[in-house]
A protein has these predicted regions:
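Heptad-repeat coiled-coil amphipathic alpha-helices that mediate oligomerization/assembly
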Residues: 7, 11-14, 21, 28, ...
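N-linked glycosylation sites
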Residues: 51-54, 67-70, 86, 146, ...
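An edge-strand/N-cap motif at the start of beta-rich repeat modules
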Residues: 83-114, 120
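A short beta-strand motif characteristic of beta-propeller blades
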Residues: 104-106, 214-219, 264-269
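Repeated scaffold domains used in trafficking and secretory/extracellular systems
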Residues: 112-121, 171-183, 223-231, 273-280, ...
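Short beta-strand elements that form the blades of beta-propeller/WD-repeat-like
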Residues: 115, 130-135, 189-196, 237-243, ...
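Structural motif
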Residues: 137-144, 156, 200-205, 248-254, ...
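Blade-level signature of beta-propeller repeat domains, shared across WD40, Kelch, NHL, RCC1
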Residues: 445-447, 454-470
């Protein structure tokens, strides 16, 4: 190509690029002008409104090269109207129990970072139900899992996590530090209590709304301890049952009434109950009932009835001849409302629960009389008051070929129903002492709630193969 041809070619290319650039600039200008008028002329349509006023603001920013039009929707949300929970509703009718949640923590922990826990429970608030447990500060596969059969150490803490998940270091929240706990929501915020320290000088720290509010010193110097399941609140008053003293002799039990984490009143245990530990509490019709563990004598469970309005209580024993502690003797021909029914070995007791509602009463217990295996629910009308009361319905929760453990009550007091639907959980213990081929002791959780329908039974056992952990 001669020099003249090169000049002509370069000139033509330059002119072509100039024309293309001009066309792009004109198109850009037209597009911006069109968008501007389209936004300005279009009436408001279908913008979402949530609990407040919805306004549209158009902001036009000019600079030398482009016109930018930004449309911002500003949603003003009213602050939630928070109120203390009121226990005015009755319990719902229950004819059977439907599955609510199962976390499968041990199965998942075979190949994931799952925390070692025990003493689990569930507790609800206005927006969600959460799982709780006392962590051992290590994972199932961690070397520190050796020795987690022990109940009390400096490494335990009350943790909570979203219901249905397995507890891991990545999805749990520490509520407080300690080796015994309870927690409940009063409708405005959550109160959590943890006991920690040496056996002869333990103490409790009461947290409310995420902050420590009250401290309680040991009053008997012998393992200050509490419920290991949720407390219950009525109009801001949250009674909690605490015990300090021997596990196999007379101890000192107190009912402490809290409001926003602060002590309102303290009562010494009154009534015929002789030993109280690990109460499972629920509320209905402005009364709170706690079904507890007599670790000293009774295979029948003590019952504490609390009036949160007057901040008073009474205690007795479950009248039914259906015994629900473990270990226990065979069911006798008659129950006892005022004294413990002795017998059973080798275990002195286990945390349990009941819902006591006249003809709508249900009792939970291990299937085995002697060990923490299996779990069943028995409908026993008038179990609270009739020493001849017997089962009229039965549902297996865990078959007797599988381990169970602690169990307790909880209710979603914020559910949109005309009654409070009873719910319960069962701790599914795995590892030591029964399965000594692993170094740890931990659990998974299964939870069920009441149904008016008559549903079938199924065994909701843990399901982990311990051999996979070797």
């Amino acid at each position: 190509m001669n020099p003249n041809q090169k000049i002509i070619c370069i000139s033509a290319t330059g002119m072509t690029l100039s024309v293309v650039s001009l066309l792009i600039g004109l198109a850009n200008l037209g597009l911006n002008i069109g968008l501007h008028f389209k936004v300005g002329d279009t009436p408001e349509t279908g913008t979402p409104s949530t609990n407040g006023t919805n306004s549209t603001t158009t902001i036009i920013n000019y600079n030398t090269q482009n016109n930018f039009t930004n449309v911002t929707n500003i949603v003003l949300v009213k602050e939630e109207n928070k109120m203390f929970t009121n226990l005015s509703k009755p319990l719902c009718e229950v004819n059977s129990w439907h599955i609510l949640s199962k976390d499968n923590a041990i199965r998942i922990g075979e190949d994931a970072h799952i925390l070692v826990t025990r003493e689990p429970y569930l507790s609800c608030g206005p927006h969600e139900c959460r799982m709780f447990a006392l962590s051992q500060g290590t994972t199932l596969r961690g070397r520190h899992a050796n020795g987690t059969i022990h109940d009390r150490s400096q490494f335990r803490a009350l943790i909570s996590w979203e219901m249905g998940q397995a507890p891991s270091p990545y999805n749990t929240r520490v509520e407080c530090v300690g080796w015994s706990s309870t927690s409940c929501h009063d409708g405005i915020s959550r109160m959590s209590i943890c006991m920690s320290g040496p056996n002869n000088n333990a103490s409790a720290v009461v947290w409310y709304n995420g902050r420590p509010v009250t401290e309680i010193a040991s009053w008997a110097g012998n393992i200050l301890r509490t419920q290991e399941s949720e407390c219950v609140c009525h109009n801001g008053i949250c009674p909690v049952v605490m015990t300090d003293g021997p596990a196999n002799n007379r101890a000192e039990t107190k009912i402490i009434y809290f409001k926003e984490g602060k002590i309102q009143k303290i009562e010494e245990l009154t009534g015929s109950a002789q030993h109280i530990e690990e109460c499972s509490c629920y509320g209905a019709e402005e009364v709170i009932k706690c079904i507890c563990r007599d670790n000293w004598k009774g295979a029948n469970r003590p019952v504490i009835t609390i009036n949160p309005t007057t901040m008073t209580h009474t205690s007795k024993y479950l009248c039914s001849k259906i015994l629900t502690d473990t270990s226990r003797p065979n069911d006798p021909g008659s129950g006892n409302c005022d004294a413990p029914i002795t017998g059973g070995s080798p275990d002195p007791g286990v945390k349990g629960f009941a819902f006591l509602d006249g003809g709508n009463s249900w009792l939970g217990r291990t299937i085995s009389k002697d060990s923490r295996s299996g779990y069943e629910m028995l409908k026993v009308p008038n179990a609270e008051t009739n020493n001849q009361s017997a089962p009229v319905a039965h549902q297996i929760i865990v078959n007797n070929q599988n381990w169970s453990g602690y169990s307790g009550a909880f209710i979603d007091y914020w559910a949109d129903r005309e009654c409070f639907n009873p719910c319960f959980y069962v701790e599914l213990i795995r590892g030591r002492p029964k399965e000594s081929s692993v170094l740890w002791t931990s659990n998974s959780i299964v939870a069920l709630c009441g149904s008016k329908e008559r549903l079938g039974s199924w065994s909701w056992h843990d399901g982990a193969e311990i051999i996979y952990f070797k």
